[in-house]
Amino acid sequence: MPYGTRYPTLAFHTGGVGESDDGMPPQPFETFCYDSALLQAKIENFNIVPYTSVLPKELFGNIVPVDQCVKFFKHGAVLEVIMAGRGASTVEGTHAITTGVGICWGQDKNGELIGGWAAEYVEFFPTWINDEIAESHAKMWLKKSLQHELDLRSVVKHSEFQYFHNYINIKQKYGFSLTALGFLNFENADPVTIK
């Protein structure tokens, strides 16, 4: 029996940061710092697969904090994510990293929800920052990107944009910040039949 394309129906938002004085080339911040950020985000025991940024309407109202679903996580499972994540080195002049994910929902001409889109944001800073700076920068750039997603498709905004962000002031040699949406439950669209 054929199955149609798969789409998520439950998601969670999460984030984490990590830092280390140790690392392996060619991207030393990917090794220890990334693992620490995954641990803080509570997704360290998944096999992470990145998505692009289109959200089915079934996710509207079904995006929860990671703490609501962590007890259901399966060690070694595949986790499909939309993730903003980057590392940096203080040796190269970066002393803070901010990451964020934003979500917009669109409606058709009758006001019916058609689905959504996500945008990812990463910014490096030459000095330490605080949460107010991290949040304001994330919202500013994500708002611009989300509005572009709607304008590109000539779609009207259905509801308020949603924003999630994280940041790190790097105190060691390397640092990493990530913000992510993870997808847990799925359904299948009707299979396609070509006649």
UniProtKB/Swiss-Prot annotation:
Its cofactor is pyruvate. The modification Pyruvic acid (Ser) is found at S53. It catalyses: L-arginine + H(+) = agmatine + CO2. Binds 1 pyruvoyl group covalently per subunit. Belongs to the pyruvoyl-dependent arginine decarboxylase family. It comes from Chlamydia abortus (strain DSM 27085 / S26/3) (Chlamydophila abortus). GO terms for molecular function: arginine decarboxylase activity. It holds the Pfam family PvlArgDC. The keyword GTP-binding does not apply. This is Pyruvoyl-dependent arginine decarboxylase AaxB. GO terms for cellular component: cytoplasm. Disulfide bonds: none annotated. Transmembrane segments: none annotated. Keywords: Cytoplasm, Decarboxylase, Lyase, Pyruvate, Virulence. Its EC number is 4.1.1.19. Trimer of an alpha-beta dimer. One of its GO terms (biological process) is arginine catabolic process.
